[in-house]
Amino acid sequence: MNKCYAWVVRFALLCALSFVFLFPLWGQPSAPRATDRIVVTLSPQPLEGNQKVYFSISEGDQVSLESPSSGTLTLGEKKNRKQAVSLELPSGTTSFSLVGSLREFFIPYRAKGENTPKVAALDLQEAPRLLTLNCAGNDITSLDVSKNTSLTYLFCDANPIAELDLSRLPNLTSLSASDLKLKKLDLSANPKVAALGIGGNPFDQDFNLYAYSSLPLLQLTCDRLGLEEFDCSKFPKLEMLYIHGNKLKSMGDLRPLRSLLHLSIGDNPLRDFDENKLPHGRLRSLYCFGLGISSLDLSGFTYINKVDCSNNQLTHLSVNRCENLEVLRCGRNALTELDLTSLWLKELQCDRNQLSAILLSDRANMQKLSCYGNRLSLERMEQLVERLVKSSPEQSPRVFTPFTTRAEVPESNICPKSLVDKVRTAGWEVRVVTGVDAQGREITEDFEGSPMALEPTPQQSVFLYPNPAGEYILVENLSPNTWLCLYNASGECVQKELTGASGSLKLPLSHLPVGSYFLRADEGVFPFIIER
């Protein structure tokens, strides 16, 4: 009984003390939770109606639209620890503000097929807890990150930013600032930077890449800077080096870079490219495009996964012992045959060569194949299509590009519509290259909408020679006294001729540009090319 009484006394005393100390706080508002605020100014848009803006935050972050009040914020899918967010803003909106708990901000997080406005300015003064900022590909001219002292990752590529003050970011570990308007970049206050991208900036003549040699760099992107030399001993721990598009005349010996996994050295006027001086022990990807080399032997590169050796003068390419190779891009060379039967390829780009055969493994799980602008016969094309039909890739859609209608690219591949239908039935999308855009990227259209959908006659009773043709082409075994029509690759009839009583005809071609053509007669459709 005494013990019970003692506990009652203690409880009463505790309640009394709580009342004494907590009573002064009753009725007072609780301390506000820390809130981040980001103000976004949009570039002018010519579009009418409501505007849609997409961005992403970290999966655990919270965000709400502070203004304009008439806007709508919707949370989208979660992927790779990121939360997609979409905004619908009234027409004429020039800015909006977000509040919440924000550690990561990626804008614009563009949705496929959506025409979203770009960002003209970011006010980050009230977002001190921000750890990651990605604002690449916008119209930002000035970026103030002086209050974002916790920032560790900054990606601001492709903006017209002329100055970048990073002096208050001591924890910065990754900086991607390529294609800005920078004349100089001081990283003396950022000793932790391990990943650095500065390609395509108009740095002053006294720019010194080795000023960053004291940084613990693992990744370095310094492409298109006009560099005339590179001393790999200054950056011994590199795992990734992108140095393409410079003025390097000598590659030197890169074998000391024992940790190197990814190397891009293309589009340099190298005089001494030697694959034997590369650190082949661990290399996973190699980009050696546009070097003018005629031979490439990668037999010792056991772990390599991706190779881009396009736009060279290759007549010999050896990759058969690259057992981990999945992506091979060797277009715009002078190769006549590709034997890839030992590889488990997923993507092959071998367009604009002189290939008469492309041999793939039965085990290849092809997802993309571009082989236009070659000399594949009907028999070889049938073999190729059989391999594509049997492959069982992991992704869809699968894309097959066997043709081009570009006049400057001779097309001698023979792929009847029956073969196209066969590969389409197996789930492949068949494309035709029709041109290139201002950035040099290929423009394609669906096979069915192109003039290549004309059915070439696979077993020719009609003879055309020479093929490739030059100033003329001879056509034999035609029906007598019938009209022929000559089509260019765009599907336009550029010439009509009447056969004689013999069923033979000599067609003058000197007035026509080089490229791919089709001769249509009663007997069928016959492709040929003009070369000079």
Report each predicted region and the residues it spans.
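Canonical leucine-rich repeat
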Residues: 122, 143, 164, 185, ...
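Concave beta-strand-loop units of leucine-rich repeat
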Residues: 107-118, 134-139, 150, 155-160, ...
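LRR N-terminal entry segment and analogous cap-like coil->beta motifs
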Residues: 69-139, 301
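Bacterial N-terminal signal peptides
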Residues: 11-24
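C-terminal outer-membrane/trafficking sorting elements
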Residues: 457-465, 469-532
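Short coil/turn motif common to extracellular beta-sandwich-like domains
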Residues: 44-59, 466-474
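Short proline/glycine-enriched turn/loop motifs at strand-loop junctions of beta-rich domains
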Residues: 57-61, 99-101, 127, 148, ...
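Residue-level detector of functionally pivotal "anchor" positions at catalytic/ligand-binding pockets or at interdomain
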Residues: 436-465
